[in-house]
């Protein structure tokens, strides 16, 4: 069964492929099929994930899954939230997508640290919402949620991962997300929690 991932993020594809390895599905990015990214005009993760999944399913003519995720910082009223990926406004280099993403990630992290200067409350959560559709007009989307709680560091730690991983410290594990091996992140992350729920939903409703 082919399922289109409504994202062109190569690192997210690798992470989700690892998480969904137990299912008899072929997960491919929409970019590999020539599908442009959908608009994300909504104020909640679930609405944006649904919009992205519906767009990918309509363009590909098959099942689709979308992840809308982000960082929600308590002291900032939940920001950056749904705009986590583009929190900072930057001029991106005319280079490949991964190089652009690295520049954007660095700018986002710098802005977050600036907004939290002098703030004692560093509590935050990584939030992931996964939405899967059998087709674009599927009236019964599968929806799964994951939340990973931690604290924002004063400076980046670690070289692995992407996005805000170097700033997100997990007290229970004693290190930042960017200091974790990929296997550990795949077990513990917000996306892993959502994926486990989605695996159960797919088995029960799509693959039974």
Curated annotation (Swiss-Prot):
**Which SUPFAM superfamilies does the annotation name?**
ITPase-like (SSF52972)
Give the GO cellular component terms, alphabetically: cytosol
Task: Give TM regions.
Answer: none
Residues annotated as binding substrate are 7-12, 69, 162-165, 185, 190-191
Could you give the subunit structure recorded for this chain? Homodimer.
For this chain, the family text in UniProt reads: Belongs to the HAM1 NTPase family.
Q: What is this protein called?
A: dITP/XTP pyrophosphatase
- What organism does the record attribute this protein to? Methylibium petroleiphilum (strain ATCC BAA-1232 / LMG 22953 / PM1)
């Amino acid at each position: 069964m082919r399922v289109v991932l409504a994202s062109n993020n190569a690192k997210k594809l690798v992470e989700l492929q690892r998480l969904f390895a137990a299912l008899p599905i072929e997960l491919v990015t929409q970019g590999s099929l020539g599908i442009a990214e959908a608009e994300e005009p909504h104020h909640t993760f679930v609405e944006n994930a649904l919009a992205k999944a519906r767009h990918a399913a309509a363009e590909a003519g098959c099942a689709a899954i979308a992840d809308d995720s982000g960082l929600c910082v308590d002291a900032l009223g939940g920001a950056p939230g749904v705009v986590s990926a583009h929190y900072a406004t930057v001029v991106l280099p005319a280079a490949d997508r991964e190089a652009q993403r690295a520049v954007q990630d660095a700018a986002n992290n710098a802005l977050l640290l600036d907004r939290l200067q002098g703030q004692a409350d560093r509590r935050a959560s990584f939030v992931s919402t996964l939405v899967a559709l059998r087709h674009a007009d599927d009236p019964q989307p599968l929806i799964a949620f994951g939340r990973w709680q931690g604290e924002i560091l004063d400076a980046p730690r670690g070289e692995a991962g992407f996005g805000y991983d170097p700033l997100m410290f997990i007290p229970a594990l004693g290190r930042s997300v960017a200091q974790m091996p990929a296997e550990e992140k795949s077990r513990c992350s917000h996306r892993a929690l959502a994926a486990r729920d989605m695996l159960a939903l797919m088995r029960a409703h799509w693959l039974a």
